[in-house]
Regions:
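Bacterial N-terminal signal peptides
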Residues: 7-17
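Short, flexible coil/linker elements and helix-boundary hinge sites characteristic
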Residues: 1, 15-18, 67, 243
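Bacterial N-terminal signal peptides that target proteins for export
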Residues: 1-7
Length: 409
């Protein structure tokens, strides 16, 4: 009898409290593209392929008033803030540079150059989840690890790369670089992280005779389990050995082949790109692309020393997409022959990335406030979408299916 009463009591408790429920399933995600509007401090979200329809947009500086108060109360920070405005910002504050979504698609992590930080923005509320202030006074390019759990950010003025937990913003490690760390690229499934330092790009000492003033420009390769440097590469000696002493060794956008055997990169002041064999540690080819007759050869007119800034590769490794920034075009290049296709007119294209379906290259046209998609197969423009003020970085990301942008704040 006692056993029956206990069983009845247990059943009654289960009815009253409810049966244990399985954990809620994670929301289904859709792939999108994020476009960072550097001067506006906003992000536009567009479809990652097809017609590239705009899905919405939101601010990545909801805390701007607080940040500006902190800056204006600190004379040193204020001096750097105004220096960024008059230098790389071309008279504007640089409010968003790079961005990636968290693996669950609920937040966007963005670097904010003028505010010298990295923040996580909740994609439902538009509010900050966390903020990490970088060392020094400017945040720049980022990279996300292949598993999506870590994000690396270049701290320009402190010659440091910080590696953060993408969910919490906690620093997992950091390492020293050359002068003005810029591009970051994970390789070997995330085992290594490559950082390219570009040196001083904000002075007018751009003539070859003044190259020595540009500082220490090198690649720093670290092991991501220890963040210790395993290799440094100064392309100066490699370029000289190839017979191109005239080219800068400041590496700008860079992309590896799918098998990691070749690295393609742009350098300061040059209308073209370089091919580097990773295993043999040699420059193997240099491609010079056409100059726009309307573009001045005065190096001081190139934005932050970049004549061309933007490089992507088709998923099969067969084609390269080049953003010819100061020459106002983009073009698809056959990687085997290095023959360029049609020169697609573009207004100061500043970045290139691959569409979600791998068929197109998407460039940001920073002077026209739009992004354009160019077919890898035909080399022709297939779509253009209006975005915000001065688009730069374009990145693939994910949001929940049915996502709508948070209210503007």
């Amino acid at each position: 009898m006692a056993r029956k009463l206990l069983a009845f009591a247990a059943l009654a408790a289960l009815v009253l409290t409810g049966a244990p429920q399985p954990a809620a399933a994670a929301p289904a995600l859709q792939e999108v593209m994020f476009v960072g509007n550097n001067w506006a401090g906003t992000v536009d979200v567009i479809r990652s392929s097809g017609g590239y329809a705009r899905l919405g947009g939101f601010s990545v500086v909801p805390d701007l008033d607080t940040r500006l108060l902190d800056i204006y109360l600190n004379p040193i920070r204020l001096a750097y803030f105004l220096g960024i405005r008059s230098g790389p910002g071309e008279g504007h504050d640089q409010l968003v540079d790079d961005m990636y979504t968290t693996p669950d698609g609920t937040a966007l992590v963005a670097s904010r150059p003028s505010l010298a930080d990295v923040v996580s923005i909740d994609l439902r509320t538009g509010l900050l989840r966390w903020r990490f202030g970088v060392s020094g006074y400017r945040a720049d390019h980022m990279a996300v690890s292949p598993d999506g759990t870590q994000v690396a950010v270049s701290a320009s003025t402190s010659n440091t790369v910080h590696v953060l937990d993408i969910a919490t913003g906690r620093q997992l490690g950091s390492f020293a670089t050359g002068d003005k760390p810029h591009e970051n690229v994970y390789t070997d499934g995330g085992r290594y992280l490559w950082n390219m330092s570009i040196g001083e790009v904000n002075t007018d000492l751009d003539a070859p005779a003044w190259d020595w003033t540009k500082g220490d420009r090198r690649i720093t390769v670290v092991d991501t389990t220890t963040f210790r440097t395993v290799r440094t590469i100064d392309m100066r000696a490699r370029l000289d050995a190839y017979g191109r002493r005239d080219l800068s060794n400041a590496i700008r956008p860079a992309v590896f082949t799918p098998d990691g055997s070749r690295l393609y990169f742009q350098v300061s002041f040059f209308n073209g790109f370089v091919e580097y064999d990773v295993a043999t540690d040699r420059i193997t080819r240099v491609k010079t692309l056409p100059e726009n007759p309307a573009t001045s050869d005065d190096r001081t007119t190139f934005v932050n020393d970049s004549r061309h800034h933007g490089l992507a590769m088709s998923p099969d490794g067969g084609k390269l997409c080049v953003a010819g920034t100061m020459d106002d075009y983009a073009t698809i290049v056959d990687r085997a022959t290095l023959q360029e296709g049609p020169l697609v007119p573009a207004s100061k294209p500043y970045w290139a990335t691959v569409s979600g379906d791998g068929r197109d290259c998407v460039i940001s046209e920073s002077a026209a406030d739009q992004v354009s998609a160019i077919s890898f197969a035909t080399g022709r423009r297939v779509a253009t979408v209006a975005v915000g003020d001065h688009p730069q970085r374009v990145r693939i990301g994910h949001v929940p299916v049915g996502w709508t942008a948070p209210a503007t704040r």
